[in-house]
Amino acid sequence: LHQHFVTNNDRRIISQDMNRKTIGYNHARTELSTSITAKWMPTERLGLSVTLREEMYGAQWTPLIPAFYADYLISKRGTIRAKASVSRNYRYPTLNDLYFQPGGNTDLVPESGFSYDGGISFAVGKEGVYSLHGEATWFDSYIDDWILWLPLGGNTNYWTPLNMKDVHAYGVELKAGYDRMLSKEWQLGLDGNFSWTPSVNRGEAFSKGDRSLGRQLPYVPVYSAAVTGRLAYKSWRLLYKWCYYSERFTMTSNAFTYTGNVPYYLMNDVTLEKLFSARWADFSVKAAVKNLFDEEYVSVLGRPMPGINFEI
């Protein structure tokens, strides 16, 4: 059982036009989540589980949200496992979705739908020497009333969330990791992931001239990848992270125009971390260089992201 109280009391002036001021919103709601899980192992290799979850947002309860999971050990050698799941999705709009100023939309309805996924994984290694693991997952989701923030256009310069009637999100995710003990004090690690995630509007057009049907959702990259390298010596950690994001369309029509798409970009980060241990606590100090090669890129059209920057 989980319960928390969500509130926003943002009273700052967001914009001012002549005699009109736009300020933040002041809304709150209680959110409650409860779930129950049953597990069963009919054989030594097969595991099954069912989860029933229900959530409350303010005074409204979601329908019962079930999920079914299956896990089968194909081979003990290599720890090869097959996994599959079927689950119902139900998501209420956030407070920002409803009330953000400017742009919030109080007419939004909750997202709902079903998701299916299946995959296979393996893990091999020698204790104290090395470990190698990998995973491939396929997923398929059908979501009604997908909440999507879009620019209004015209004389306005802000975004608003809308419900997209029917969205088909599917794809493949690949993950792999390798760890090696070079000595008692030195450790080397490498992790990588790749995603192919089309998200397509299969429902209704927003208007008579809307060309979004059968096209990728705006600002959702079809391809993304990341590689992280780690080198550890005693209590020191050095991390290098490389990320790739494919181009993203800025309009529901997926038009290939100067303003119709955001180019792909690469990102490189380096982090140095020192771990400390005391009687009363364990803590760490980090120093990071973000955007190491000072790439010029944007995640949202017309909003340049920071060049090389530093964090401590």
List where the protein language model places each region:
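Gram-negative outer-membrane beta-barrel transporters
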Residues: M41-G47, T137-Y142, N163-T252, F293
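Short loop/turn motifs that connect adjacent beta-strands in outer-membrane beta-barrel proteins
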Residues: E44-R45, S75-I80, G125-L132, M181-L188, ...
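Membrane-embedded beta-barrel scaffold of Gram-negative outer-membrane proteins
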Residues: H4-T7, L73-S75, R81-K83, P110-Y170, ...
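Outer-membrane beta-barrel "beta-signal"
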Residues: Y69, D117-G119, P306-I312
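Surface-exposed extracellular loop regions of Gram-negative outer-membrane beta-barrel proteins
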Residues: L1-N9, G24-Y57, P63-Y69, Y178, ...
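Transmembrane beta-strands of outer-membrane beta-barrel pores
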Residues: Q3-T7, L32, L52-G58, V86-Y92, ...
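Transmembrane beta-strands of outer-membrane beta-barrel proteins
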Residues: L1, L48-V50, P66, I80-A84, ...
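C-terminal beta-signal and adjacent terminal beta-strands/loops
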Residues: Y244-S253, P263, L272-I312
